[in-house]
Amino acid sequence: MPASAVISIVDDDDSVRVATNNLLRSRGYVVHTFASAEEFLASANLDETSCVIADVQMSAMSGLDLLTEMRAKGRAAPFIFITAYPDENIRVRAMKAGAACFLAKPFAVHRLIECLEAALEAGRSEAGT
């Protein structure tokens, strides 16, 4: 049910944030965007986030470091990683760390939506709702 899902997009590329924001809003999701992992961690949106879509490589804190930090804070929101530099070692690390999906930019819209729906469903199942 998209209306209740809050998606946080964390990417240092403004064009990716805007395009992904527009796509998800058009599908009924509530979306918050952040230019860095640090900006997201400092926000009031941690507890309401249903899923995080994060770039792997950002200028300061990476998406993988963000996932580690979120888990250390007890936040279990699913993560979808997107990257312009797909690397098999990083993909394996991301999936072992608990990522729901790992997508190379540019990604097909339907693939992102499939990943998001699966991640949200898995998150609801884990929460028992």
Predicted regions and their residues:
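Two-component/phosphorelay signaling modules centered on CheY-like receiver
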Residues: D14-H32, A119
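The feature encodes the CheY-like receiver
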Residues: R17, S59, D87
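Alpha4 helix (beta4-alpha4-beta5 surface) of REC/receiver domains from two-component response regulators
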Residues: D65, P86-C101
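C-terminal output helix
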Residues: E88-N89, F107-E117
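Active-site beta3 strand of CheY-like receiver
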Residues: D47-I53
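Acidic catalytic/metal-coordinating carboxylates
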Residues: A35-S36, S62-D65
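Active-site residues of response regulator receiver
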Residues: D55, T83
